[in-house]
A protein has these predicted regions:
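Alpha-helical structural context detector biased toward long hydrophobic helices
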Residues: 1-6, 12-328
Length: 328
């Protein structure tokens, strides 16, 4: 059986929602690295060779890629229903789409870079605090033999701006995904969902399309935002349809004297508070601005929408962890 080596970090079916409608759909792409604009087949966008490969797995190195394809197939059918007018979703469809969004939130190179940088930052701090002599004494007591050259390189890298460079394996990344999905999916399905249909305005997408939205009333624009604290989560589904997982706190405050948190959560998951609305200029700006800000290396758009992409774009986002290395 042929083993797939071309792994999409954003599914091809999803990118087709922003592509041309010919037999081999194409999508506009803007590189945040050099500003270059091009048109490519959707099947070639966000492809990384062996990104999820599990070498030596009895079911083939592409076993996780195949599992993602299964999840994508189920989600594709649900998104198609929503785009074609079936809203709100059944509980089963909501859980399918919520699970897909959780996987998408975790599966990209941004998460792997975060893992690399987190481990590298921690190790750099530990080595810097120990000092060269402490590192050598610690390594001398270990079972593994580490050459002086490697020791010196680690000590030197620890005090450099980027610290020690770590590389997470596909297996480590996949383990991280599978551990977190059951925990994080609640923060997707447990929000009121708003489907927004745009007529004149068009949406973009990017290589990390699930974006966290900060509370618009938040005065500190530099404050961090996490999955639990985000005011909302925006996901452009196609160039004309966006999905906003909105803030549940208003519901909690409104129903606090009538329902327990568990009862309210059940109501939310049932879709009782979901609704649909027509897109506005302000809402299109919310989606597109968060898509642009959340992109790491590539912004994508329908080939006919190239003129709508701003000339001024941020550069590539390579740092996922901002932490100063402790000097010692």
């Amino acid at each position: 059986m042929e083993v797939s080596k071309r792994h999409h970090t954003v599914p091809n079916f999803y990118l087709k929602g922003f592509g041309s409608t010919d037999s081999k759909p194409k999508i506009g792409a803007v590189s945040l690295d050099d500003g270059k604009r091009l048109v490519m087949p959707t099947s070639n966008a966000t492809v990384r060779k062996n990104f999820y490969a599990l070498d030596g797995h009895p079911d083939g190195a592409d076993v996780f890629e195949k599992e993602l394809s299964r999840i994508e197939g189920d989600a594709s059918a649900v998104i198609r229903k929503a785009v074609e007018g079936a809203w709100s979703l059944s509980r089963e469809d909501r859980e399918i789409l919520g699970t897909f969004l959780t996987f998408q939130f975790l599966r990209g190179p941004d998460t792997r870079a975060w893992m690399d940088q987190t481990q590298g930052t921690v190790l750099s701090k530990v080595i810097t605090q120990m000092g060269a002599e402490g590192v050598r004494k610690t390594l001398a007591r270990s079972d593994k033999e580490v050459s002086d050259e490697v020791q010196n390189r680690l000590i030197q890298q620890a005090v450099e701006p980027d610290g020690i460079i770590m590389k997470t394996t596909p297996a480590g990344h996949i383990r991280h995904i599978l551990e977190l999905v059951p925990e994080l999916v609640r923060y997707f399905v447990g929000r009121p969902w708003v489907l927004i249909r745009f007529n004149r305005k068009k949406l973009f997408t990017c290589d990390t399309p699930v974006a966290l939205v900060r509370d618009p009333e938040q005065e500190d624009v530099c404050a961090g935002v996490g999955l639990m604290t985000a005011w909302g989560i925006s996901i452009p589904l196609t160039r004309e349809v966006g999905l906003l997982l909105s803030n549940p706190m208003a519901l909690v405050e409104e129903a606090a004297d009538r329902k327990t948190p568990r009862e309210l959560l059940e109501d939310v998951i049932s879709g009782r508070y979901d609704h649909e609305q027509a897109g506005s200029t302000k809402m299109a700006q919310l989606f597109n601005s968060h898509t642009i800000a959340n992109a790491r290396n590539w912004l994508f758009h329908h080939p006919d929408d190239a003129d709508l992409v701003p000339d001024e774009l941020p550069g590539p986002r390579n740092r996922e962890v901002e932490s100063e290395v402790i000097s010692g």
